[in-house]
């Protein structure tokens, strides 16, 4: 069975699904407070001059894990610059990541991790993926878990989307995220000192 697609890859079935959801949401009287909080964070990030945060990333390859810590700064255009802080053997490596890719700079050190999720993401790009998803991903759900707001967000509207579970803490700022591909956690991000500029 063939489905006709519009430019950009949206099939008629997906378009119909989006229209039905939009009609149902129009009938809602106030929206979910949890969704409102998630969308408020998105609005703040989109309107801001950027943000800064520290993150510890763990990449899970199934048979092996790698953990490293980075300091990150996102500018008003969504470009993320980072510097590796730990482990000491790769500390000082820095780079920039944006929609077009990334660039690393280093002295006598190399930061090389295999690709994850069928070549969609590298561990070093995980903080940029978190920011990109918070500012423009498809919000699937939100639930309160004790003092944390747990969001499920797809990084895109595509069939091969990565799913991010994001936990917001005090001030509705991110404190943790997990990136899943085909229902398997491939990346864990522990976020500290998140500040919107």
Where are these regions (language model features)?
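Short, solvent-exposed coil/turn segments at beta-strand boundaries
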Residues: 47-50, 73-80, 96-101, 146, ...
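N-terminal leader/targeting segments and the immediate start of mature chains
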Residues: 27-74, 79, 197
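Extended beta-sheet lipid-handling architectures
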Residues: 52-55, 67, 95-99, 177-179, ...
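Gly/Pro-enriched, hydrophobic low-complexity segments
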Residues: 141-197
